[in-house]
Amino acid sequence: MSEERIPKRSEVPEQFKWALEDIYATDEKWAEDLQKLKAMPERIAAFKGRLSESADTLYDFMQLSDEISVLCDSLGNYAQRRSDEDTANAKYQGFLGQLMNAYVAVNSAGSFETPEIISIEEDKLQKFYEDKPELKLYKRALDKLRRKKAHILSEAEEKILALTGEMGQSPENIYSMFSDADLRFPDAVDKDGKAHQVTHGSYIPLVQSEDRVLRKSAFESMYGTFDKFRNTCAATLSAQIKAVNFYAKARKYESSLEAALDGTEVPVSVYKNLIEAVHDNMHYMYDYVALRKKLLGVDELHFYDLYTPVVPDADMKITFEEAKETVLKALAPMGEDYLAILKEGFENRWIDVYENEGKTSGAYSAGARVHPYVLLNHKDTLNCMFTLAHEMGHAIHSYLSNKNQPVVYSDYVIFVAEVASTCNEALLMQYLLKNTEDKKQRAYLINYFLEQFRTTLYRQTMFAEFELKINEMVAAGESLTAEGLNELYGELNKLYFGDGIVLDDEIKLEWARIPHFYYDYYVYQYATGYSAAIALSQRILKYGEPAVKDYIGFLKGGCSTDPISLLKGAGVDMATTQPINEALAMFGELVKEMEEAMS
């Protein structure tokens, strides 16, 4: 593919485009199914007030829910994928708008589902299972819904809570508008006096630069700007945390953490174990910080020195064909069945490979009933090869869950999602290290791996600890001020990175830059997922077929049980600190290997 000019969609060869005709042969077929969805509210309404009348009625309603899920899956995938391949195409924006209107009507028509199912008496529900054994298929789904009974309020109270919904979103919306739309950063200046635009998107590439003057300038531009608005940022974050605690209290949870984790069936202890395990392994990060300082040859290491590669000029050129071949070889330990699905995806146009005008940026995998779809914007880099392995990990997880679970349990939760993708990355990395003899390239690979550990395991855990602490402060009646938040965030950076790095005043403001603090206990899942993936990749390489069998069983599991049980079946117990300790021990070994490779 030419790099001089980004091609139009029509200029991209067919074999590099995803096969959306596998969902609908034509746009007209999509429109026919949309009409079916538009007719669903009437079919749903026929069940209102009747879910407790008989086993047959409840079963028929659950079957209708499955039918709607399958229909929405096809309609949503086709419209969203078509829109993403060329965002300038107004036709598919229109499709998405029509679909959203139909979704809203369906959801509104089915608003009676939760209250009616929750109100069925336990004895009666057990009798339903006896009267109609087919209903047992939905037992887990019904139990999950009914588990919330203790946290569902009276009808009048629920109405009031529902009215606060938009208000509860306000802190995130205000922060998003402020940070993404209103904030402007002064240009960063490099060692030659050349100006570089600083945006949220350009910031990381700028602090990855070999030019230290530019790195420092970008760092000061970013955090100097946030410093001017520190009280505004503290007020929006405080409002967000107060809202989260209000909803937890209103729904009779012990804490905001318990409320957030309850929906995904993850015990609170898993969150706290993560923080404890990382605390116990801080020495590895201190070793890495010391090594980074030594390799960069600086008198003092600053936070703007953390992102620049210590082996800057060893990147490899890897074409898409080479990337596919290497990924196939690297994932050979997964066994023939896994590789067959991977080849099917490569050969049957599951992947939209290259950039074109108007195409959505980045990369993702989308599970669909026919087969998954993967969006890439492939450049011939090492990073893009890892992205291919990562997204195909998600894709095969979706494929196996869809093929092996009934519709109601075919989706998987975020807590396990990153495991399947990151396990592939870990296997690819270990394959490359085993098969790379060039000293400089090995060091480049190890540096890449170490940075994943730093940014995913240590950094996200630090975020998770900060989030927990500010929630505890609000729950205890303390106020969140800019000064207090800066102090807490500075202390955590000192704890996580040690004395080998200068605690720049600017880094104390980083909390103001992180949108994830508005996502309600979300970030910890990156760290737990990464730990589980590292542990499972090691297990697969060590034990072979039995470990692979366990792992494939996990990929087939969808959400047929809770995420901790699913991962336990794969061979990793996230209810303990062991997987995190093992992953961090591997990080420690890699730091040593990096030191040897660069000596």
Question: Where in the sequence are the language-model features?
Answer:
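A well-structured
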Residues: M1-D313
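Long, K/E/R/D-enriched contiguous segments that form extended
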Residues: L295-P333, L339, Y373-V374, H397, ...
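C-terminal, non-catalytic "cap/extension" segments appended to globular domains
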Residues: S10-E14, A25, I117-I120, R140-R147, ...
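Active-site recognition of the HExxH zinc-binding catalytic motif
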Residues: K252, K379-Y399, S421, A426, ...
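Post-HExxH zinc-binding segment in Zn-dependent metallohydrolases
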Residues: Y412-Q441, F449-E451, T455, G529
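Catalytic zinc-binding patch centered on the HExxH motif and its immediate surroundings
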Residues: M316-I318, I351-V370
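Conserved helix-loop functional segments at active or binding sites
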Residues: K329-A340, A366, H394, S398-P406, ...
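Short pre-active-site segment immediately N-terminal to the catalytic Zn-binding motif
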Residues: M316-I318, V370-A389
